[in-house]
Amino acid sequence: MAEFAEFIAAIDQGTTSTRCVIFDHNGAEVARHQLEHEQILPRSGWVEHNPVEIWERTASVLMSVLNATNLSAKDIAALGITNQRETTLVWNRNTGRPYCNAIVWQDTRTDRIAVALDRDGRGEVIRRKAGLPPATYFSGGKLQWILENVDGVGAAAENGEALFGTPDTWLLWNLTGGPRGGVHVTDVTNASRTMLMDLEKLDWDDELLSFFSIPRAMLPAIASSSPLQPYGVTLADGPVGGEVPITGVLGDQHAAMVGQVCLDAGEAKNTYGTGNFLLLNTGEAIVRSGNGLLTTVCYQFGDAKPVYALEGSIAVTGSAVQWLRDQLGIISGAAQSESLARQVVDNGGVYFVPAFSGLFSPYWRSDARGAIVGLSRFNTNAHLARATLEAICYQSRDVVDAMAADSGVRLDVLKVDGGITSNDLCMQIQADVLGVDVVRSVVAETTALGSAYAAGLAVGFWAGPSDLRANWQEDKRWTPTWGEDQRAAAYAGWRKAVQRTLDWVDVS
């Protein structure tokens, strides 16, 4: 750690934007800079990002936040990275040029690959070894698609010229030199989202690679989330302007777990973003799900044993509110969803299931599509706004119930973070739907904070978990107001609505 370095920098490379946040010893945000990037939608179901644009945005936010605070590399003890998971990039080792756009986690072009895996029995092997169901969500199928459909990638992959990575790997490679010797590495949390890593061995699995015809030569090394030795060091002529060790990498939802200090078995958090991601810490135990959840690595610090988690991934939550704004035009901004929904006392019998790209946890139905059910002439825009907020909360209830069935753990409190947590009505509905207290922390940027914690622990900026727990502070708490009968009746309506969305698209 630099002698007078008083800060940790964290890069948060997300689905819609990239930000850099500076934190102090108290885990308090000192400064941030954020830039959005283009969402490329070539055809229905396809979602892409430009890797070069993402790298340029990352470099820009790094330089901007340092300039705005008059800080330099010598003030930064370490750099952490957190990122959108599963998004798949392939680039040339010698030139640094991507072979194609990144295929984003939301992209569904690989639906037939996923169906074929389940049909011939390979899906059960993937579930057993990787902890994941075959789905369009994960990187393995996306990488197979690139190898099969992008000219030149297959041959380049065989001879080691083509490199695969999720956004963390792409940023690490560029920050540490790119074609001039950049490191090609990922962490265990990101690797656990590919369908290619054995959860127990924490290494790429040859049988899983064979399912997707992926050459091992193109894969990054797998390291701890907070390794004993840095992943690498930023270059003096790079965007940081000096040498700073990169010592923490976590997929975004794993980073939020660390940022929320959910470090003990039985603790859970729910992140509300484009989608929702609810994780339950299961300690050193690998809990296999029989109820549609994912088994994943939560984090690994140093050379300690990894900590695992159960995860419920929900594809469409915050983006459903964006749909009200951008496609229907019934609100002018996300904040208006609350004021509009408050014009009614309930949903008026309306349920909205936003299965725009199918349903993720716990259903895993790529054949589902969105539906608004229960409409009558009595209903208004306000009922639809209310139903949209409720859909976010009911989908989370689906996951919480599945977690209880898999783990035997029933929550008594749920920590929450993400943009929608500023919507008081939505958080009150969440407490009512779950029947447990919902708690928001003071620091809103828990994802960036988690990667900062991972980086800081590696260099002694924080001594250990007790320091992180001391930093966590409650900002607001919502307590349930519904009775059990109301809760049960409302949720039964939701489950009925979900059934109406199934078998809509032929993915056979």
Curated annotation (Swiss-Prot):
Stored InterPro entries: ATPase_NBD (IPR043129), Carb_kinase_FGGY (IPR000577), Carb_kinase_FGGY_CS (IPR018483), FGGY_C (IPR018485), FGGY_N (IPR018484), Glycerol_kin (IPR005999)
Q: Which residues bind ATP?
A: 15-17, 274, 318, 322, 419
Biological process annotations from GO: glycerol catabolic process; glycerol metabolic process; glycerol-3-phosphate metabolic process
* One Gene Ontology term, aspect cellular component: cytosol
- EC number(s) from the headed UniProt entry: 2.7.1.30
- Keywords assigned by UniProt, alphabetized: ATP-binding, Glycerol metabolism, Kinase, Nucleotide-binding, Transferase
SUPFAM superfamilies for this protein: Actin-like ATPase domain (SSF53067)
NCBIfam families tied to this protein: glycerol_kin (TIGR01311), PRK00047.1 (NF000756)
Q: List, alphabetically, the PANTHER family matched.
A: GLYCEROL KINASE, SUGAR KINASE
Protein name as it appears in the record: Glycerol kinase
